[in-house]
Amino acid sequence: KNGGKIVFTMSALKSSTDIINKSYSYIFDSKLQKFLSTKNKDLILKDCTTQLEKIKKLRVLIIGDAIIDQYDSVKPLNKPIKENILATKYIGSEVYLGGVFAAAVNLSEFNNNITICTAIGNDKDIKNKINSLPKKINKKIYIEKKKITTRKKRLVDSAYKKKISEVYYIEDDFLSKSNSVKINNYLSQNLKNFDVVIMIDYGHSFINKDIYSVLAKKSKYLAINCQ
């Protein structure tokens, strides 16, 4: 009625996923690429889900630095005439639990028996957040009353959501001797109850030689995430 012409071609079908996979195949080494090309994808998926089911039953201890991640949203203003700096207008703040807390929350998606062992300072703005962690996360938290928890504050451009600068509040000698002794005693008595121990060490003075020594000697399986 309106004219036109339909042509059926015999060219190979191309999909965006196939093109992307082939274009970025250099990301994988040759052995992994060969493995992925020969294995049935459904079997790989089944194997992955089986492994995740096994993880769910493990008793896991996550020990290491507690971190407060603070994001201050700001609006950049014109550069001050008298100083060569960037001036910003404060919009608002968002505070999140990082370090061992973030790791525990992520792992709790796959595991129902997690214990956190860490120390925090006298920061009042994180107590409610700690109490609101998933109930299946057990908490063994020691308090340093005269210290502050490591806090990483970022200034974020409110329009483009990009970081402008960062300020870290860190106590170089965060963990007191008394709490170090308490933690070592706890580990010595309870490490036998955990199938896996994940040590998270960001270099913020929580993991000391004594703590590392008892973890290395008495953990059934020790995984280390450090910076």
Model-predicted segments: where are they?
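Active-site cores that bind ATP or allylic diphosphates and position pyrophosphate for catalysis
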Residues: K1-K34
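Ribokinase/PfkB-type carbohydrate-kinase core domain
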Residues: N21-K82, K89-Q227
